[in-house]
């Protein structure tokens, strides 16, 4: 503050002097050789100084000491000002020679008098009568030179009037608006003072004397007004400047808000500018998303306001949502929620084209999406054929994912990248439903900001489920919809992982019968808002669903949480250790029906996804874990980093969860990738519940959902897609047979009932081969990174924990003892650090 203030003060003085000279010269010219003409410049300067002092007093405690004490106690301190002012005045003195020397003294004495005069200047602004009181005040202030100065001051007062109209008016402007913003506005003032200074200079506050106001909000503005761009150029708040000039008074009162507003519009404009391209064309959205993720991240750190900025613009321009959502969602997931719906509607093609871009731009899912893209693209072709079913599934999944949206939002960043590839069941769906599917990716991207790591997990889950869905597609016939039904199943699987399979409601007519509609549909509906289940058939409903998920407090999301927690149907039950059997039963029941496989997976995914949310919400770790997850995701957005982090987390964070997740993964590897999820929901959720007791609360959710989905997609290679967040799950899913963990296989035996559907995964095994390759690479990288970053992991343990548990699964050793030791070791690291 002191440094900034000093710099500002110096600049202000310099610019003020320059402006004072200019104004004095101008005033002198109109005034002519009249003595007062010479004084006006210094008088104005003195006033500016006084107003600055007051503003400094009001605004900065440090500033008052330097300026107030310096000018008031010591005229010598003011001497430079008065000299500089008089130097300007010297030009005036040329006009009024006799007043020159006196001008210096008067200017020296004037600064105190003029500050007092400023209040009177308010009157003087109203009428010349006010000038007289300033003279009296000045006289009272300085008894001995009073008479001289009074007489001398009187002429300056007249110039003051003209300066009041010019400079003083600007001072009034800065003074009057400043009062409300004083306290809160000072920090912002620095940022906005450039714009306000510029605006004030241009606006020339009509009321000069509100010294208090000036002190409050326009300390820099007032100085800047007189000083021109002194503070303004350094601050470089040019963008807001025009508004500041227009609304200097209201601006000062609303300075804080205004500053926020201006940046908001700027960001809104940027977001809108970026957003509309996605709306316009798929390729622009890709570029926009790729480019915006970086700008928005910068804005985000700049302030929480950016989120507001983008949030408001997002609402205004749905197109803007996709670009800002990846990075800004952390700040405003709810804000993006509604625009999200718009995004869903507006970005049918965009979602497809931009989602992959986002996936790449989002590092966590970026690596995964690349492998995922092939799977997703492969699966995507089938998905488009059944757009109606896709829409239903989309609605269901998005609602589910959104009820689950806290984890899903991370998808936005991670999933957006893989969305097209299949990170998002929605993205997958996007190919299905031109308009609605895109909406899902956008919402996913929007929501991801806050729970980004979950998004990664879910992106992985989506990918895994997606692949599994494709694999399940052969089993899809039980659905009885044929190819479209298979498409729905794919979507459902994507949703199962990401949105707890709300697509089941979408497919509820074909799928609910196979699923044991009570278990599958009920579960999905409880997971997603009933509207989700109902609107499933409607693309329009999808948008509300997105809003529901996007809005953390959105109407739909709360219902989802209610279903997860209160309704709980299967979500909370699954989330809870006891209800997990219900999920398992549902899985088995649904698993009995080949078509119900997705529904079962959905139930478990819901349980896992819902459970993670519940866990997160139930445990303080939810917020902290979420933030950590986001940090981890942001920090290690690269799929390799994510994998490494997750692996490391498994080693040190998922020791307990590691075995459970290993089981889960092994279950997942079972042909019934979704049943794996079911078991994961059951056993893993139970483990998560236990682990939840620990810091894994948030972590199990993404990892669980991820691993389950990966396992669900294991046959399909969905786990491959999910390898990024749940690489361990993916790798183990691929390697589930070789996996040494017998517990997961036990769980697998439990999930085997659903194996019938997983049989289709064979086609996806080709993808699995590629995914396995990637997974192996990631394993190596993760091992290396683990060795290097485990200390970091210890630091980020809480952050990474949510994601890492699934990675903990990645370690083939699955040594419950060793991973716990690692975790403990990491924990020690955290404690030590």
From Swiss-Prot:
Residues 8-25 have a biased composition (Basic and acidic residues). The keyword Hydrolase does not apply. Expressed predominantly in brain where it is present in the neurons, but not in astrocytes or oligodendrites. One of its GO terms (biological process) is phosphatidylinositol 3-kinase/protein kinase B signal transduction. Coiled coil: none annotated. Disruption phenotype: Triple knockout mice NYAP1/NYAP2/MYO16 are fertile and appear healthy. However, compared to wild-type mice they show a clear reduction in brain size, exhibiting a reduction in the size of the cortex and striatum, but not the olfactory bulb or corpus callosum. The total neurite length of neurons in these mice is also significantly shorter. Residues 162-171 have a biased composition (Polar residues). Residues 111-120 have a biased composition (Basic residues). Keywords: Phosphoprotein. Residues 248-257 have a biased composition (Acidic residues). Residues 76-181 are annotated as: Involved in CYFIP1- and NCKAP1-binding. Residues 220-239 have a biased composition (Gly residues). Residues 275-285 have a biased composition (Pro residues). InterPro entries: NYAP1/NYAP2, NYAP_C, NYAP_N. Phosphorylated on tyrosine residues by FYN upon stimulation with CNTN5. Phosphorylation begins at 14 dpc, reaches a peak during perinatal days in brain, then gradually decreases. Residues 1-45, 64-191, 219-423, 645-674, 736-765 are annotated as: Disordered. It holds the Pfam family NYAP_N. Interacts with ACOT9, ARHGAP26 and PIK3R2. Interacts with components of the WAVE1 complex, CYFIP1 and NCKAP1; this interaction mediates PI3K-WAVE1 association and actin cytoskeleton remodeling. Activates PI3K and concomitantly recruits the WAVE1 complex to the close vicinity of PI3K and regulates neuronal morphogenesis. Belongs to the NYAP family. This is Neuronal tyrosine-phosphorylated phosphoinositide-3-kinase adapter 1.
């Amino acid at each position: 503050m002191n440094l900034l203030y000093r710099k500002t003060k110096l600049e202000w003085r310099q610019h003020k002097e320059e402006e004072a000279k200019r104004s004095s010269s101008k005033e002198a010219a109109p005034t002519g050789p009249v003595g007062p003409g010479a004084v006006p410049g210094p008088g104005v300067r003195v006033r500016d100084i006084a107003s600055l002092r007051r503003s400094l007093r009001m605004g900065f405690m440090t500033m008052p000491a330097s300026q107030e004490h310096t000018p008031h106690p010591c005229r010598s301190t003011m001497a430079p000002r008065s000299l500089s002012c008089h130097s300007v005045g010297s030009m005036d003195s040329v006009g009024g020679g006799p007043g020159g020397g006196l001008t210096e003294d008067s200017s020296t004495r004037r600064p105190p008098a003029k500050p007092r005069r400023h209040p009177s200047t308010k009157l003087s602004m109203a009428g010349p009568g006010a000038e007289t009181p300033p003279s009296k005040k000045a006289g009272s202030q300085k008894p001995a030179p009073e008479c001289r100065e009074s007489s001398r001051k009187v002429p300056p007062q007249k110039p003051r009037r003209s300066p009041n109209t010019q400079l003083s008016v600007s001072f009034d402007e800065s003074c009057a608006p400043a009062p409300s913003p004083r306290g809160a506005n000072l920090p912002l003032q620095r940022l906005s003072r450039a714009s306000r200074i510029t605006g004030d200079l241009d606006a020339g506050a009509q009321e000069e004397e509100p010294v208090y106001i000036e002190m409050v909000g326009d300390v820099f503005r007032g100085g800047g007004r007189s000083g021109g761009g002194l503070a303004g150029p350094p601050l470089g708040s040019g963008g807001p400047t025009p508004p500041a000039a227009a609304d200097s008074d209201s601006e000062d009162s609303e300075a804080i808000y205004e500053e926020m507003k201006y940046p908001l519009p700027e960001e809104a404009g940027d977001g809108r500018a970026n957003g509309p391209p996605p709306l316009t064309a798929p390729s622009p959205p890709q570029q926009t998303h790729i480019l915006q993720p970086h700008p928005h991240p910068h804005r985000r750190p700049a302030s929480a306001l950016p989120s507001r900025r983008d949030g408001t613009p997002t609402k205004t321009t749905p197109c803007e949502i996709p670009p800002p959502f990846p990075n800004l969602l952390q700040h405003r997931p709810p804000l993006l929620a509604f625009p999200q719906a718009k995004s869903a509607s507006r970005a049918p093609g965009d979602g497809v084209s931009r989602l992959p871009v986002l996936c790449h731009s989002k590092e966590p899912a970026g690596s995964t999406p690349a492998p995922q893209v092939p799977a997703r693209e492969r699966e995507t072709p089938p998905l488009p054929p059944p757009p109606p079913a896709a829409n239903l599934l989309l609605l269901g999944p998005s609602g589910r994912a959104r009820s689950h949206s806290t984890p899903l939002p991370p998808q936005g960043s991670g999933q957006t990248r893989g969305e097209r590839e299949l990170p998002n069941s929605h993205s997958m769906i996007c190919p299905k439903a031109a308009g609605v599917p895109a909406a899902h990716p956008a919402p996913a991207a929007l929501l991801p900001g806050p729970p980004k790591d979950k998004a990664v997990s879910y992106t992985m889950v989506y990918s895994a489920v997606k692949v599994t869905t494709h694999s399940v597609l052969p089993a899809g016939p039980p659905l009885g919809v044929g190819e479209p039904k298979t498409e729905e199943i794919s979507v459902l699987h994507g949703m199962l992982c990401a949105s707890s399979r709300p697509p089941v409601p979408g497919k509820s007519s074909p799928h609910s019968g196979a699923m044991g509609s009570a278990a599958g549909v009920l579960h999905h509906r409880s997971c997603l808002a009933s509207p989700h289940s109902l609107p499933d058939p409607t693309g329009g409903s999808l948008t509300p669903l997105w809003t529901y998920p996007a809005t953390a407090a959105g109407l739909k999301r709360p219902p989802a949480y209610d279903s997860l927690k209160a309704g709980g149907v299967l979500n909370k039950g699954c989330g809870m250790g006891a209800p997990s059997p219900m999920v398992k039963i549902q899985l088995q029941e649904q698993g009995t029906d080949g078509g119900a496989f997705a529904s079962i997976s959905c139930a478990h995914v819901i349980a896992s996804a819902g459970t993670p949310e519940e866990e997160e919400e139930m445990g303080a770790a939810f917020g902290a874990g979420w933030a950590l997850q986001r940090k981890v995701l942001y920090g290690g957005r690269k799929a390799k980093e994510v994998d490494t982090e997750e692996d490391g987390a498994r080693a040190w964070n998922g020791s307990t969860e590691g075995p459970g997740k290993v089981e889960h993964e092994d279950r997942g590897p079972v042909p019934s990738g979704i049943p794996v999820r079911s078991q994961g929901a059951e056993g893993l959720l139970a483990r998560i519940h236990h682990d939840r007791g620990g810091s894994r609360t948030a972590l199990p959710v993404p990892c669980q959902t991820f691993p389950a989905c990966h396992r669900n997609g294991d046959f399909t290679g969905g786990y491959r897609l999910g390898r990024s967040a749940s690489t361990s799950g993916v790798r183990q899913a691929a390697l589930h047979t070789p996996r040494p963990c017998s517990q997961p296989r036990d769980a697998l035996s439990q999930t085997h009932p659903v194996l019938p559907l997983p049989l289709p995964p064979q086609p996806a095994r080709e993808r699995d081969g590629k995914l396995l390759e990637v997974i192996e690479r990631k394993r190596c990288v993760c091992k290396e990174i683990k060795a290097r970053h485990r200390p970091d992991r210890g630091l980020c343990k809480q952050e990474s924990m949510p994601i890492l548990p699934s990675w903990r699964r990645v370690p083939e050793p699955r040594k419950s003892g060793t991973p716990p030791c690692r975790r403990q070791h990491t924990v020690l690291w955290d404690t030590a650090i």
